[in-house]
Amino acid sequence: MAPMGIRLSPLGVAVFCLLGLGVLYHLYSGFLAGRFSLFGLGGEPGGGAAGPAGPAASADGGTVDLREMLAVSVLAAVRGGEEVRRVRESNVLHEKSKGKTREGADDKMTSGDVLSNRKMFYLLKTAFPSVQINTEEHVDASDQEVILWDRKIPEDILKEIATPQEVPAESVTVWIDPLDATQEYTEDLRKYVTTMVCVAVNGKPVLGVIHKPFSEYTAWAMVDGGSNVKARTSYNEKTPRIVVSRSHSGMVKQVALQTFGNQTTIIPAGGAGYKVLALLDVPDKSQEKADLYIHVTYIKKWDICAGNAILKALGGHMTTLSGEEISYTGSDGIEGGLLASIRMNHQALVRKLPDLEKTGHK
């Protein structure tokens, strides 16, 4: 007789055993899922490793959220800027030359470039391991570090861009300039210095960040998304103020005066990021104002991608001097010079400046 007078039939024993096996199965599968999540093998689709600081893209590529990429890009530019400022204020730059530019000037590099590059690159690479990242400075594998993002999107970004903007990770290329205007940085001309991040999708610039480390001003924008910066209310198209590189202002001045007249003003400045901000409504007293940005020589894509994205998001244009759109895939530089404008007839300006590219090759 069974205990307490209960008699179990063969069918009851079988049901009891099946229930027991079911309980054991669920307990064991839950244990395995927990173990897998610790190694990044579980989690939501497209979410990478579980946990608040895990990658924002799945291990097999998947998709990335451009809104998240913007948040990380802003943080990367600021973190890089902190390194740039710290090195400059220490007055120990460890300055050296990487070689010569096409114009024969020293292509300088400092500790500020290197340390900013490390912070910016690894913050973006840890958050988005599946995307292609191009940066001006060499990334040394021996310096590798994991810099985690807390997955928080700032309120100003959420206010402008309310919903996620997902794109295939394989379509994304990131361009980093860890210290724009290195020459001016070594001369302690701080207002020209910026750190920049750009995200291109299928070669088209879609989001840009330009950060000024010494005034702590940051401009960002996403094409068809939102921005924290805007165009000025008016521009002078007839006799514009033209911002150009300090190294070849004389080349541009001669042609500009012939094109727009003797009232045209040429503003020599350092740094492509600074020059783009000169076209916008920027609340920084050290920032000069211009109506056009012209560049006549070879330039690298990490110098201009962020500015291109910001101008495009605000309805402006950045093209070669012949009016061609710039693709941010393939090689890291462009040969055709540069013309940037906003709230102007850009193609009419292109037609007015037929000889500037030739001027840059003299």
Curated annotation (Swiss-Prot):
AMP binds at S245, H248, G271, K275. Mg(2+) 2 binds at D177, D180, D303. The chain crosses the membrane at residues 13-33. GO terms for cellular component: endomembrane system; trans-Golgi network membrane. PROSITE patterns: IMP_2. Pfam families: Inositol_P. Its cofactor is Mg(2+). The modification N-acetylmethionine is found at M1. GO terms for molecular function: 3'(2'),5'-bisphosphate nucleotidase activity; 3',5'-nucleotide bisphosphate phosphatase activity; 3'-nucleotidase activity; metal ion binding. It is a single-pass type II membrane protein. It catalyses: adenosine 3',5'-bisphosphate + H2O = AMP + phosphate. Exhibits 3'-nucleotidase activity toward adenosine 3',5'-bisphosphate (PAP), namely hydrolyzes adenosine 3',5'-bisphosphate into adenosine 5'-monophosphate (AMP) and a phosphate. May play a role in the formation of skeletal elements derived through endochondral ossification, possibly by clearing adenosine 3',5'-bisphosphate produced by Golgi sulfotransferases during glycosaminoglycan sulfation. Has no activity toward 3'-phosphoadenosine 5'-phosphosulfate (PAPS) or inositol phosphate (IP) substrates including I(1)P, I(1,4)P2, I(1,3,4)P3, I(1,4,5)P3 and I(1,3,4,5)P4. Belongs to the inositol monophosphatase superfamily. PANTHER family: 3'(2'),5'-BISPHOSPHATE NUCLEOTIDASE 1, GOLGI-RESIDENT ADENOSINE 3',5'-BISPHOSPHATE 3'-PHOSPHATASE. This is Golgi-resident adenosine 3',5'-bisphosphate 3'-phosphatase. The gene is BPNT2.
